Amino acid sequence: MNSSVRLLRLSAVLLIMAASTLYSINVRGATGSFAFTNYELGSTPGTTCPNALANCYNFAAEPAIRADNSGNFYASSENGLTGGTVAWKSTDAGLHYITLQSPNSASAGSMQFSPAGGDTDLAVASLLNGNGFYNVYVASLALTNVYVSTSSDGGGTWLLNPTGASVPGDDRPWIAADGASKVCVSYHSITATNDIFVTCSTDAGTTFAQTGNAFDPNHLWLASFQNKIGNLAIDSNNHNIYQSLSGIGSATETTCLNCSLHAVWLAVSTDGGLTFTDHAVFVNPDTSVFYGHQFVNVSVDQAGNIYVVFSDDHNLYYSFSTDHGTTWSPPSQINQSPSSTAIMPWSVAGGAGKLDVVWYGTSYYHAGTTPDNYPSSAAWYVFFAQNLQATTPGSQFSQTIATPIIHYGGVCESGVTCSGNRDLYDDFGVAASPTSGLASIIYSDDQYSNTATQPAGPGCTSSRSNTSYCDSTNIATQTSGTGIFP
């Protein structure tokens, strides 16, 4: 959910435009030989970026990205509630992206009005539809419900369903697709004590007739505001649905005043989303550790191995499961120097045992200081790490910095309750092309650059660098190094 600060900034733009030590942690790794090209995306439909016209700028944040099985990348980002959602497509391995029509408005304007435009997520079908395309689905938060927009022609047109959630009063929707026409949306229901529901459609988003509760009868205590939702994933081979989250560790902790969300969970459905069984990925014995930062993340590789990535506000860990989420490996640390702090992770899995992970990282570290209170000297980058043997205990991640500096100073991770700097908002993403194996990262940046590939938009000046006036959604596409497919 976006804060009033985000809405105020959008209004201004419209006017201008008219870890615990009780378990073993693997920290071995190596510097990766990867290369990335970076550029800003456009906001006007039909604009291809990068270009030499100085019109590749936008004011969007909290982006998402996916790749279809043909190697096309699709991405979305938000302009804030009532501002609408922006979408892009790349057909050349992420070297260029074209701005599509907004998924939740028929308007051709770059800043059209829409009740949606809050939290956004994106999914692509795993099988072709009758038109020879992979359906593309974009979820957009409108608070009263979740908008789900479907494109059956490769992003050319969209069909909008404004009732993608069956339970009203929603927050933080996630979306995942399976087969040619199944799509599921998960979300927090604020009116139902922050319960997590998964609503599914079997007709490409036209109707959402099936709703399941992510909490099984033995874990209903995870509701009652004792959890924080993570993303949703579907294994296209066995059709299992996986909902990630953080929460308390046991029913007895519902009355514990000093217990944080020190456990990571995965809700598993083997019946298409009708029912779920909740499995503990990791429960830290230190109840003061907090994993409820944006966001616990789950991904599934082609062999059905599952990876869950999570941050304790300073370091980044992953656990894997080779038995469909029933049992889990001990957590292993991913980040290494110079990323002394690692937050807001996202992952994508490819071939068996192959995993890419991205996060916002800085060389600054202070164990007693949250990133929200980091000094102005703390420089943040997008970090990229890859493990080609991620189901092997003790295996190494190769790590590199994928972007220029994207932010200085504090980074708030408390969503709408933020009192500090929220320019990076809550999440970003990475996808990998099944045809090349290489990654394309979509991320937020609040720096004034004004270069050919990152021109300054209206209102973004050198004096406003590192503020929300310069917020934009950018791309970092991998151009060399190993990939994760096949």
Language model regions located:
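Sec-dependent, cleavable N-terminal signal peptides
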Residues: M1-A30
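C-terminal PAP-associated
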Residues: V27-P486
